Amino acid sequence: MADITDIKAILYTEKTIELQENGVIVVQTSPRMTKNGLKEVFKEYFGVTPSKVNSLRQDGKVKRFRGKIGKRADFKKFYVTLPEGAAIANLSA
């Protein structure tokens, strides 16, 4: 079962702030999170049932540090569309 701890961050960028004005929240999660799991988390913890959830899997970037090659962690990003008129309290940039 999905848990609130699987949500790593709510993303705040220029693009996501524009989307928030249209009722779409962008969430970064662990790679094991599923669409249905995220819907359950939003219903249980935020009291809102999303009308639509889109997801994408993002590979971590390969970076160099002091001559050694490393890789950042992979993550999933979800675009959560809230129903018309629904909002989540204390969720603003």
From Swiss-Prot:
GO terms for biological process: translation. Disulfide bonds: none annotated. It holds the Pfam family Ribosomal_L23. Keywords: Ribonucleoprotein, Ribosomal protein, RNA-binding, rRNA-binding. One of its GO terms (cellular component) is ribosome. One of its GO terms (molecular function) is structural constituent of ribosome. It comes from the Bacteria. HAMAP family: Ribosomal_uL23_B. Belongs to the universal ribosomal protein uL23 family. One of the early assembly proteins it binds 23S rRNA. One of the proteins that surrounds the polypeptide exit tunnel on the outside of the ribosome. Forms the main docking site for trigger factor binding to the ribosome. Part of the 50S ribosomal subunit. Contacts protein L29, and trigger factor when it is bound to the ribosome. This is Large ribosomal subunit protein uL23. The gene is rplW.
